[in-house]
Amino acid sequence: MSSDIQTADNKKSEVDPRHEKRIELLKLLFAFSFRPKQEPVEQLKKIVAQLSEIDQTISALAPERPLSEISKIDLAILRLIVFEWTSSKTPKKVLINEAIELAKEFGSDASPKFINGALSQLLEDNK
């Protein structure tokens, strides 16, 4: 039994630091969504500076759901991933996978499917 615990501990220590950074940014973006007039913390300044363009992209990906009807956590996940999509060299399929994992961890039961659908559309549009 102790080997099972050790295996679980080893898996916890193997968490990708990029995933941990995304979780931290996601939490900051989520909190920012409740106080958008407040000056963003340093880690969010680049994302907030592009928020208008990011939101336009999200609106185009999910035209049946106005931004105001997307849950704040789903919107934060989409904003984070769309920002990274345009500003990093991370493979697009990796970003979609990461978004789905974040949705499973922080969103509702419907979040992973919604986010997968929206971001898959982005992948299709950029082929």
Residue ranges of model-derived segments:
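N-terminal interaction/assembly modules
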Residues: 1-112, 117-127
